[in-house]
């Protein structure tokens, strides 16, 4: 992948983990990270990837990657950013690539 996508992936790791832990990511924060044009696509990526990063069993919060828990929201945030950063980056990279391909195909269809 291009270095532009890698830069964006790195910037989206922390917001993705924040969403997974139930913390808010404001639109202004996202716009500051990736720019106005990429903010909606980035929001879609955050939402989709964050779903896979946690599990709730009753009232117990666990890591969705290694099943470690019980964890608090802050504990899950620290665990995901420190232990599973590379896995989160890979998930974000895959989903971002998928979303960008959808946008590219939609743009080509509009031109026809």
Language-model regions: role of each:
Residues 1-51, 96-99, 106-108:
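Intrinsically disordered, low-complexity linkers and flanking regions associated
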Residues 43-65, 69-105:
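C-terminal recognition-helix end and immediately following basic linker
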